[in-house]
């Protein structure tokens, strides 16, 4: 999320948008009923993971959120491909490692990529490769940063998920000619094996770990697309859950868009829209200037009965991995424009905690299981 927001804010070239109203966004949660025969989701195909690389301002990412339940290591590996105003294309590899049992393990690297190239679903750069094999396995090799040499193999365990037919939310008063877009495509539960080599040549092994893979596109400036985000990746011995929610600024009617997935080891149990994220015990953060939750709950809502909750993932946000000041690396003159004109003061709060999933399948069977959740609560503007 950090580089995604940073890239767009760095390209800010003017003012806050006028208030177009909620009709100026066509979220995937509404477009579903006009595409894919009204089905909430479909299984992904290899073409869904091809890099789109549009020739206008956008940030496109492929991210693997990994969890090793045996030793508490969690984190993510992310490739970022961004285009600023159709003029400059850059790429970055970011990596996070954190241990929920040992807070001294907290590694973050962000490295600019050189000589990068896109080939369909694959991505190559100097000292880095990411390749999709047989629509089943991703192989990642990166030695671009000696503090985080990564070699992962991720194997999909369930169907992939794309909401609607194309996963797209569009911004603009004319649906046929949108001026912005948002897209997410998922592999919600995968196994991961591999190694992480740190600067002191310590090798951290991941054996039969779990990962959630998401490919995302944000085709407009981030502070215009959303004023806040809630994101959760949960992994336990037998279940995975992901939920992603963004709320638009007033210019698009403060519209909430929420999609979520729950799986077991073999299949998709729930793919739902219009879910609910609940912040509890909020506390004002003097550093970021936001009311930040101390507890959080991600509720999954039945597609046919909006009053029926079919699952939830919840827990305390007691372990703050990092409070990310998105503006920290942005030039001062851009900060002044963004905060003064656009009203943005973006902070990302990253957490890693023990969470609990509760599932009610509607047949009287209820499942409850503890696991580990990685959460991002992002505030961009009021």
From Swiss-Prot:
One Pfam match: Svf1_C
Primary location class: Golgi
Keyword Membrane: yes
Lipid bilayer topology: Peripheral membrane protein
Region Peripherally associates with membranes, annotated ranges: 1-18
GO cellular component: cis-Golgi network membrane; cytoplasm; endoplasmic reticulum membrane; nucleus
GO biological process: ER to Golgi ceramide transport; response to oxidative stress
An example Gene Ontology molecular-function term: ceramide binding
Subcellular location: Golgi apparatus, cis-Golgi network membrane; Endoplasmic reticulum membrane; Cytoplasm; Nucleus
Key words, A-Z: Cytoplasm, Endoplasmic reticulum, Golgi apparatus, Lipid transport, Membrane, Nucleus, Transport
Free-text function comment from the UniProt entry: Ceramide-binding protein that may transfer ceramides from the endoplasmic reticulum membrane to the cis-Golgi network membrane, and is thereby required for the biosynthesis of complex sphingolipids.
Family: Belongs to the SVF1 family.
Name under which the protein is recorded: Ceramide-binding protein SVF1
Species for this entry: Candida albicans (strain SC5314 / ATCC MYA-2876)
Gene name linked to the record: SVF1
């Amino acid at each position: 999320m950090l580089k995604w927001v940073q890239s767009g804010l760095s390209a800010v070239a003017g003012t806050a948008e006028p208030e177009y109203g909620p009709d100026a966004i066509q979220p995937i949660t509404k477009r579903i009923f006009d595409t894919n025969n009204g089905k909430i989701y479909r299984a992904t195909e290899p073409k869904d993971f091809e890099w789109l690389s549009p020739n206008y301002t956008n940030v496109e990412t492929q991210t693997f959120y990994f969890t090793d339940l045996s030793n508490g290591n969690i984190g993510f590996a992310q490739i970022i491909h961004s285009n600023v105003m159709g003029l400059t294309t850059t790429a970055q590899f970011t990596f996070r490692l954190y241990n929920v049992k040992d807070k001294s393990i907290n590694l973050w690297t962000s490295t600019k990529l050189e000589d990068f190239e896109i080939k369909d679903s694959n991505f190559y750069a100097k000292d880095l490769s990411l390749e999709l094999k047989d629509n089943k396995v991703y192989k990642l090799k990166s030695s671009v940063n000696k503090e985080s040499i990564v070699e992962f193999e991720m194997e999909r365990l369930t169907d992939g998920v794309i909401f609607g037919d194309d996963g797209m939310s569009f911004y603009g008063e004319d649906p046929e000619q949108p001026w912005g877009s948002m897209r997410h495509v998922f592999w919600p539960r995968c196994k991961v094996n591999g190694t992480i080599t740190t600067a002191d040549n310590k090798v951290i092994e991941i054996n039969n770990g779990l990962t959630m893979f998401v490919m995302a596109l944000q085709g407009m400036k981030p502070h215009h697309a959303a004023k806040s985000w809630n994101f959760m990746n949960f992994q336990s011995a037998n279940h995975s859950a992901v939920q992603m929610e963004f709320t638009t600024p007033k210019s698009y009617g403060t519209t909430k868009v929420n999609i979520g997935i729950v799986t077991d080891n073999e299949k998709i149990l729930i793919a739902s829209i219009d879910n609910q994220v609940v912040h509890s015990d909020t506390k004002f953060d003097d550093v970021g200037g936001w009311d930040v939750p101390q507890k959080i709950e991600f509720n999954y809502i039945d597609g046919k009965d909006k009053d029926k909750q079919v699952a939830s993932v919840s827990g305390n946000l007691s372990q703050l991995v990092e409070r990310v000041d998105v503006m920290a690396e942005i030039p001062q003159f851009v900060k002044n424009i963004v905060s003064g004109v656009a009203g943005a003061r973006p902070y990302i709060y990253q957490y890693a905690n023990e969470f609990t999933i509760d599932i009610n399948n509607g047949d009287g069977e209820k499942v409850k299981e503890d696991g580990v959740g990685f959460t991002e609560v992002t505030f961009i503007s009021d």
